[in-house]
């Protein structure tokens, strides 16, 4: 009986992810399609985590949206296909964006782009500001040395989904024109959760 409980506990961890480590900030993202809770890894990605939490604390994601869905079927010109959803602040608030941050590469942080990873969107290295994305499935091509971005520097992962992957998948499957969600999925609020 104890062995069965152990197997069930391990299976639950595999299905639902590890709980947030002590001291990891947790953030609740409430969208029009449901709620996603993420753990922010400020230990391994301090610059990226602080950047995201600054936007959260200033409530700049409120009224923003998940505006992009990348599926295996909507990347006809890409040899390296990924599955992510991308969100950002309300375009009317872009003048309140902070300066771009330094890219914390995954070969430095030890974090990886797995299903449920939250990471900062960027163009070139050191250009990330407010847009972030969540991996729908494992995305090793987004890590340092990966081939998705021609510069090979990867993206700055900084946390993981604790609950709400079904909401992530629902957003990814929402109607879109190409990769643009139509309409975008509104973000109602993004707040830190109190420490346990």
Give the residues covered by each predicted segment.
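Cyclophilin-like peptidyl-prolyl cis-trans isomerases
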Residues: 2, 17-196
């Amino acid at each position: 009986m104890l062995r069965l409980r152990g197997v069930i506990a391990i299976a639950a961890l595999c299905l639902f992810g590890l709980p947030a480590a002590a001291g990891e900030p947790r953030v609740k993202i409430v969208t029009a399609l449901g709620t996603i809770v993420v753990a922010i890894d400020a230990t391994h990605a301090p610059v990226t985590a602080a950047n995201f939490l600054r936007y959260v604390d200033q409530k700049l994601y409120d009224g923003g949206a998940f505006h992009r869905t990348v599926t295996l079927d909507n990347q006809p010109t890409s040899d390296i296909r990924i599955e992510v959803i991308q969100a950002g602040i309300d375009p009317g608030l872009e003048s309140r964006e902070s300066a771009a941050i330094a890219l914390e590469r995954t070969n430095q942080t030890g974090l990886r782009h797995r299903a449920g990873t939250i990471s900062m969107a960027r163009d070139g290295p050191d250009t990330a500001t407010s847009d972030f994305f969540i991996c729908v499935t494992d995305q090793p091509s987004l890590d340092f040395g990966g081939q998705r971005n021609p510069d090979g520097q990867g993206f700055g992962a900084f946390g993981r989904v604790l609950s709400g992957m079904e909401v992530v998948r629902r957003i990814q499957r929402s109607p879109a024109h190409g990769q643009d969600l139509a309409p975008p999925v509104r973000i109602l609020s993004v707040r830190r959760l109190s420490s346990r």
